[in-house]
Amino acid sequence: MSFMDQIPGGGNYPKLPVECLPNFPIQPSLTFRGRNDSHKLKNFISEIMLNMSMISWPNDASRIVYCRRHLLNPAAQWANDFVQEQGILEITFDTFIQGLYQHFYKPPDINKIFNAITQLSEAKLGIERLNQRFRKIWDRMPPDFMTEKAAIMTYTRLLTKETYNIVRMHKPETLKDAMEEAYQTTALTERFFPGFELDADGDTIIGATTHLQEEYDSDYDSEDNLTQNGYVHTVRTRRSYNKPMSNHRNRRNNNPSREECIKNRLCFYCKKEGHRLNECRARKASSNRS
């Protein structure tokens, strides 16, 4: 199998002279697909340019090949077609990057982003899933669109009343701090399954189901007319999940409640004092085993 046949992404790629193919390092984690990840394109190009600045390149063709090896379909197929049309030995790297940007970059739709955010709530998802999905959607927001204070307000509207009050008490200064405080002050049972309790072995007893929001990767209705001002007045979602069944014979309710853990400064995971959840050795050991 030739070197060019090993390039991922499919499609035929023009042959290059051997001197155009130095032993440059490939980073599997640095990729751009060109499908539902337009918001990642600027960072992708920046990281590619940073990596390339540390390597001596014989010509533009080798730089194009390096960038191309970090593309997945459909971006990879576009690169193949674009280079075929321009000619691999004639096209410049700047022209290639400019073409990639113009073809795949789409300005973020603020209304769609806010519409997706308003579908989230701690009551429906638990704090773990809420944080995961909020981060994924928030990454699509333009970097300077909101102040940190506005970002914190947007996030805390999704929390339950109890969690909201605790986060507010800590007075977080950044969105990251607010999300961490919400995670730390919510009991383990509430993170994945809101309202559920733990049995004697610490396993979650699934006594109810929740309706989860579909991933934001799918396209939204073009008739969506949610405005930013309308979103500001959106009322936070209240708990709407089904209450778990209470007739489990083997259930033990001797675990400290969330309020007791907070009051007595106990770890939410092992129920012992002297450390917070992110410092819990038992939790880290459990994560390593899984």
Curated annotation (Swiss-Prot):
A zinc finger (CCHC-type) spans 265-282. SMART domains: ZnF_C2HC. The N-terminal domain of NC, but not its zinc finger, is required for nucleoprotein complex formation and its chaperone activities. It comes from the Eukaryota. One of its GO terms (molecular function) is zinc ion binding. GO terms for cellular component: cytoplasm; retrotransposon nucleocapsid. Keywords: Acetylation, Cytoplasm, Metal-binding, Transposable element, Zinc, Zinc-finger. Pfam families: Ty3_capsid. Capsid protein (CA) is the structural component of the virus-like particle (VLP), forming the shell that encapsulates the retrotransposons dimeric RNA genome. It comes from Saccharomyces cerevisiae (strain ATCC 204508 / S288c) (Baker's yeast). Retrotransposons are mobile genetic entities that are able to replicate via an RNA intermediate and a reverse transcription step. In contrast to retroviruses, retrotransposons are non-infectious, lack an envelope and remain intracellular. Ty3 retrotransposons belong to the gypsy-like elements (metaviridae). The modification N-acetylserine is found at residue 2. GO terms for biological process: retrotransposition; viral translational frameshifting. It is found in: Cytoplasm. The keyword ATP-binding does not apply. The gene is TY3A-G. The keyword Lyase does not apply. Transmembrane segments: none annotated. This is Transposon Ty3-G Gag polyprotein.
